[in-house]
Regions:
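Short, charged/polar, low-complexity loop and linker segments
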Residues: 5-13, 42-46, 139-144, 352-354, ...
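Membrane-entry segments of alpha-helical transmembrane domains in multi-pass membrane proteins
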Residues: 17-28, 52-59, 251-255, 294-298, ...
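Active-site-proximal, well-structured secondary-structure segments within enzyme catalytic domains
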Residues: 129, 133-134, 172, 176-217, ...
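Short pre-active-site segment immediately N-terminal to the catalytic Zn-binding motif
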Residues: 460-479
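C-terminal, non-catalytic "cap/extension" segments appended to globular domains
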Residues: 1-21, 27, 31, 213-215, ...
Length: 699
């Protein structure tokens, strides 16, 4: 029998990956749609007066874990990012329009919406969480076109179905292009400057691909060390241009027209729903409220960070010019983008005598896992135990049971660490089962259904004779995604659609970026950073250098993120049809946050998954917004102790466990005692506030 049609009978009802076949998905999708439609018919044909219980609860259950369509969709689309193949891609192309049509059928059903509207108008005696669910349900239908006339609804169907297909095509094109390129080296002299770990990894990749020598790819664990350490400027340029021109070539994977069409589709959707721009539509349900709030934040950051970033660039350029004088290059004498990583490393060594390779031996993955889990234990008292009886979708994946401080079961946690064929680049948190209370009609809390969450990353792989040795940056990435996972694990709400990370998108990055702070905390590093061969702890002098170098090129990094935010807003504040050429438009859109050379052929937009296919359209500013929040929140821990359990418990109770049950600023203020200011972020980064700056609330 199709495993989606029967009880899983696995530990904690985890997904039976070992029993799922490709053909099971389509069958389960179609049966899920049939059951959904059947349930909706029951709801709208109910002769009783619409109530919260017989209408809103039913609608909530139609998209929860116990709903077949939700279950199969969750598994399929998670695997499409983490473990796909040509057959999965083809099925996605087939199912996407069917699923989008079904979603439209639900949200544009006039009889269902009328019942929801009646409850919204006449509800009584709801708890705050029930009221939030009702408001979200009503708003969700309105924002999906429920108030449009028939012609408007039909047009909206066309737009959303096309947008969903193009988003999928964008992602599939990007993955194909990223995996297609390799830099093959057979002359060992061309490896000059590369550390042993990078050489060994490249040799292993070559062996896996049946090639001689060394193979470098566009996956970050391969790309980043090459750009940082290789003395071969020509090869750095080749690799840089390969990465930064993907999906711009004259082939089937070109994303330029897809991006233009997505921008226009989203603008038209927003205008059809009564908004001037897509950004206005998105920001209606964000802490930032409107485009003014977003631009105010981005411009404040430019004012604060740009002077320091200019100094950082001048310092880098001096080192480049000095190096070029003693070692002339056949390429241009200007510092180019493919030089930045190489000379940043040299400058960091000169100023702090520290680099990522120096630290790798102390960041063996198994020890890092112990450290991250240990941090969660110190803060919240939770423990992790690997359970090999829990099915996984790839041998690389580990599954853990998570137990609360009282020993009770809390969650299942999956960890998928390394790059491989069929896996998207980057890092993300995922969820296979959301938390909710399983209740009966009398509203008794019967069972707290616990979440199944995980992290999917592309960290350095082990080699034939070495374990996986991470960079400090990869440790930070792990902490970031683990922070999202804690948000999911600690969820304690009645309704799944309000639990865990189901919050406004400019709040969702707070728990993740908060955890990044620990990557440069001495007392945390001392808990797990031991040499993988000798067992010696990371020397105090190295830890001191890590802490001192924390803000190295911080202003440049900030402007880079701001530039992405500006680009995002430039696309989604369009009021008329977007017809411009993507590449030159991009260069102009982020110009005031870019200090270096802009190359005419490179393009970020065509690989900018966040804003084209990842849900961050008109929302990329969220990363900097959340950074203001996380710096402010972590200052409380710095004051009371970074492992202070009382503070951690308040953070868990007031923020992490609440999900989207209240307005995010209400939750934050309850924890912090007031609204955040940008000041803590400036202080953390060692940035002097501009003269015009006054301590201000986050926007």
């Amino acid at each position: 029998m199709n495993p989606f049609f029967e009880p899983y009978n696995t530990p904690h009802d985890t997904v039976p990956f070992d029993r799922i076949r490709l053909e099971d998905f389509e069958e389960a999708f179609m049966e899920g749609i049939r059951r959904d439609n059947e349930q909706i018919e029951k709801t709208i044909n109910n002769p009783e007066k619409p109530t919260f219980d017989n209408t809103i609860i039913n609608t909530e259950e139609d998209k929860g874990y116990y709903d077949l369509l939700s279950r199969v969709s969750t598994v399929f689309f998670n695997l499409l990012s983490a473990e796909t193949n040509d057959e999965m891609d083809a099925l996605a192309q087939k199912m996407q329009p069917i699923l989008t049509q079904h979603a439209n059928d639900v949200r544009l059903n006039p009889r269902l919406f009328e019942r929801i509207r009646q409850v919204h108008l006449h509800h009584r005696k709801l708890t705050p969480e029930e009221k939030m669910l009702l408001d979200n349900c009503y708003e969700g239908f309105v924002r999906s076109g429920a108030l449009l006339d028939e012609a408007g609804k039909e047009r909206l169907r066309q737009l959303t179905e096309e947008a969903s297909m193009l988003s999928l095509q964008f992602s599939q094109n990007l993955l194909k292009e990223q995996k297609a390129f390799t830099l093959d080296i057979t002359d060992e002299a061309q490896l000059d400057g590369l550390p042993e770990t990078a050489r060994e990894a490249a040799a292993l990749t070559a062996k896996e691909q049946g090639k001689q020598g060394w193979v470098f790819t566009l996956d970050m664990p391969s790309y980043s060390p090459f750009m940082t350490y290789s003395t071969q400027r020509e090869l750095r340029k080749q690799l840089y241009m390969a990465r930064n021109t993907i999906c711009t070539h004259d082939n089937a994977e070109n994303n330029i027209e897809i991006c233009k069409r997505l921008i226009n589709l989203r603008r038209e959707i927003a205008q059809l729903l009564g908004y001037k721009t897509y950004a206005d539509y998105v920001l209606k349900r964000r802490m930032a409220s409107n485009t003014r709030g977003v631009y105010r934040l981005l411009n404040d950051l430019i004012d604060a960070y740009k002077p320091t970033a200019q100094k950082e660039r001048e310092e880098l350029k001096k080192l480049f010019d000095k190096s070029l004088t003693s070692n002339p290059s056949p390429l241009t004498s200007k510092m180019m983008p493919w030089d930045s990583g190489f000379y940043s490393h040299k400058l960091q060594m000169k100023k702090y005598n520290i680099d990522q390779e120096m630290l790798r031996p102390y960041f063996e993955l198994s020890k890092v896992i112990e450290g991250v889990f240990g941090l969660a234990n110190k803060l919240y008292g939770i423990t992790f135990k690997e359970n090999k009886d829990i099915p996984v979708y790839h041998p690389d994946v580990k599954a853990y049971e998570v137990f609360d401080k009282d020993g009770s079961y809390l969650a299942v946690f999956y960890a998928d660490f390394h790059p491989r064929k069929g896996k998207q680049g980057g890092a993300w948190m995922t969820e296979y089962q959301g938390q909710q209370w399983e209740i009966k009609d009398e509203k008794l809390r019967i069972k707290n259904v616990r979440p199944h969450v995980g992290v999917v990353m592309n960290l350095t792989k082990p080699t034939e004779d070495k374990p996986a040795l991470l960079t400090l940056g990869e440790v930070e990435t792990f902490l970031h995604e683990f922070g999202h996972s804690l948000h999911g694990m600690f969820a304690n709400t009645r309704f799944e659609s309000l639990s865990g990370t189901n919050v406004w998108w400019d709040f969702v990055e707070l728990p993740s970026q908060f955890m990044e702070n620990y990557s440069v905390e001495k007392d945390f590093l001392r808990t797990f950073a031991f040499h993988y061969q000798t067992g010696e702890p990371l020397p105090d002098e190295l830890i001191d250098r890590i802490v001192k170098s924390r803000n190295f090129m911080a202003a440049t990094a900030c402007l880079r993120q701001v530039s992405f935010g500006l680009l995002d807003m430039a696309y989604y504040t369009q009021r008329e049809e977007f017809t411009e050429d993507i590449i030159p438009f991009e260069k102009q859109a982020w110009k005031k946050a870019i200090l270096g050379e802009q190359l005419p052929d490179t393009c970020m937009t065509v690989q900018f998954s966040h804003i084209m296919a990842g849900g961050y359209a008109a929302g990329y500013y969220s990363y900097k917004w959340a950074e203001v929040l996380d710096a402010d929140a972590f200052s409380v821990f710095k004051k009371h102790g970074i492992f202070n359990q009382e503070t951690a418990q308040r953070f868990r109770d007031e923020v992490l466990s609440k999900g989207g049950t209240e307005h995010p600023m209400t939750l934050y203020k309850r924890f912090r005692g007031g609204e955040p200011t940008i000041d803590a972020l400036l202080k953390r980064n060692g940035i002097k506030a501009p003269k015009s700056h006054k301590p201000s609330k986050s926007h």
